[in-house]
Amino acid sequence: MNKNCDYCGLTIYSETYHKCVESSVKINDETKIVNYKIITIDELGILAGKNDREAQDEIVYRYLNQDAINLSQKNIKPINWENIIERAIDDQYFTYFLLFFAFDHDEYHVIFDVLFDVLFENVKLAAKTGDSMAQYNLGQMYYRGISTKKNIQKAIKWITKSADQNNKYGLINLARFYEYGDGVLLDIDKATQLLEQASCQNFSKAQFYLGRIYMYKDPPDYKLAFKYYQQAANQNHSSAQYFIAVFYKTGKCVAQDYKKAVHWLTLAASQGLNSAKIKLAEMYMKGIDVEQNYHKAFELLNSSIYDDGTNNYYDEVAMTELACMYKRGLGIEKNISKAIYLHIKSRNTKNIFKIFEINTITFINPINVDCENNNLSDIDQLESKIIYKLQFLMIKLKYEWSNIYHDDISNSLQEIENSFTRLIKLRIQLNNSSAMINCLSFKKNTSYKFDVFNTKNAYVNYYVYDDISYINIGLNNIKLVNNFQKNLDKFMFCNIFLDLELALENKHKEKIDDLINAVKNDDRSHQLNIVKDLDNIKFVLSQTKKISSKLIGYVNILMNDLKSNTHIRNQQFQLEYANIFGYD
C-alpha cells in the first residue's frame, strides 16, 4: 500500500519517485539527495510554482522530450512563473513549451494571446536568421493561428526548414503532417523515414511515434512496434511504458509475463498516466500476478480522476470502475449515492439503469386555490394577499396605531413576513429547478433507496410527500430541498403566531388597566381613546387569526403546487441529464 509523506501529504509511490514539496532536504525524516529527473510531474509543478528554476526546467524538458502533456496538469501553471517573457525571448525551447502548453489550456488563452503577440516578431526574426528551433516555433504559430492568421502552407514551409537542419522537433512534426496527410499528400513511408531520422538522436517521442506507426499499420509489425516502444520506455516515456506492459500482459510478440507487465504499469502509473493506473488497478482487482488488493485498486482509480486535473476517456473508464466498487463496497465503504454520482458523471447509462428505471408519470393539471372563499385562482395571488395583510398591519401599527405599538408585536409580524417570504422564494426556486423529480425511480425489490438514507453528503436523496416518491440528484438540488423542508414547518408559524397573540393580549390587559384608571379619574377623552385602542387590538387579533389560518392552509396548497409542477421539473432534469434519456 502506498504511504503519504509526513510533510507535504502527497502519495509516495516509491522512494525514488518522491521529493517532498514542503521540505527540500527530508522525506519522512530521511535525508535525500534531490534528483529532479525522478520526481513526479505533480511534485515538480508544486516546486515550479514556488519558482524553483530546476523544477521548471525539468518540466520543460519532459514536455519537449517525453509525454508530460498526457500526465497530470493540475500543478503546472507557467503563467505564474517569474520572467516568462524574458525567458521565452532568450530561449526558443521555452517558447516551444509555452506553445505546447497553451494549446492544451484554453482557460489561459487571453493571457497567452497577449504573450505570443509580444513573442511573434522575435520568433520570426530568429527563424529568418536560421535558428532551427525558432523555425519550428514559427511553423507552429502559423499552423495554429497564434498571433497570426492560420496558414498551413507557411507552417509546413518553416517546419520543413527546421527538419532540414535535423532538428528533432521539426522532424517528428513534419512526420505527423505526412502520417495524416495534413497539408501534404499522405505518405506513411516518408513519415517513417523522418521519425527514424529523429529516433537516431535517441529522441523518445520519435521512438514512441515509430512504435505506434508499426503497431497500427496494415498489416501491423508488432516486433518493430515493441522495439521502438521499448527504446522510448527505457527513457521514461510513460505512454511507451504502458504499451510495453500491454505487450507483456497479452503475450503479443513476446512471452506473456505478468510480472513485467506490473513492473512497467507501475512505472507509468507512478508518473501519473491514467491508462496505466486503470490497467494496474484491474490487475490488483483480479489478483493477476499480484496479491488481490481492492484498496490499492481503489487508490489508483481514485487518483486517476481526482488527482490529475484531466478530463478524458480514461476518466470516464475510471469513474465507471469506481462506481462499481462503491456499489459493492470493494476497497471502500459501500456508498450507493457515490456510485450513482460516478455513473452519471461517466455517462454510463447502462449501469444507471441497473439502479433506476425511467417513468412517464407527470402532473400537468394546474391547481385551483380556494382559501376561505377568497376567489383566488393561483398560489401567487394567495401569497400576495397574505403578504399584503401582513404589511398592512405593520404599517398601521407603526404609523396610525402607535398607542398599541409594541416591539414584540412588530417583531413577530416581521418574523412571520420574513419566514413566509423565504418560503415563497424557495417554492419558486424549487419549481424552476431539476429537484423533486419522478421521471426516474429506484428499481423495485432493491435496497438502493434505503441505502441512500444512510449516506453522509449524499449526491442522491429520496423523499415521499403525500404518498408520492420523489428523487433529488445533485448536491445543489439536495441542499435546496433540505432548505425547503426546514422552512416548510407549520409548527414554526404556529409558535410565532402564539407569541404574537400573547403580545397582543398583554397590550390588551395594559389598555384595560389604563381604562380603569381613566374611569376613576373621570377622564372621558382618554376613555374614548383607550376604547378605540382596544378596538384596534381586537382588529389586529382577528386579522392575525385569519392570516394564521391562511398560512396553515397555504402549506397544504403549496404541496399541491409542487405536485402539479412536477412535469416542469422533470423536463428540466431531462435537459440537464440528457444522456440518461438518450437525447444527445
Swiss-Prot record:
Gene3D superfamilies: Tetratricopeptide repeat domain. The keyword Ligase does not apply. Sel1-like repeats lie at residues 132-167, 168-203, 204-237, 238-273, 274-309, 316-351. It holds the Pfam family Sel1. SMART domains: SEL1. It comes from the Viruses. InterPro entries: Mitotic_Regulator, Sel1-like, TPR-like_helical_dom_sf. Keywords: Repeat. PANTHER family: ACTIVATOR OF C KINASE PROTEIN 1-RELATED, CHITIN SYNTHASE REGULATORY FACTOR 2-RELATED. This is Putative sel1-like repeat-containing protein L18. It comes from Acanthamoeba polyphaga mimivirus.
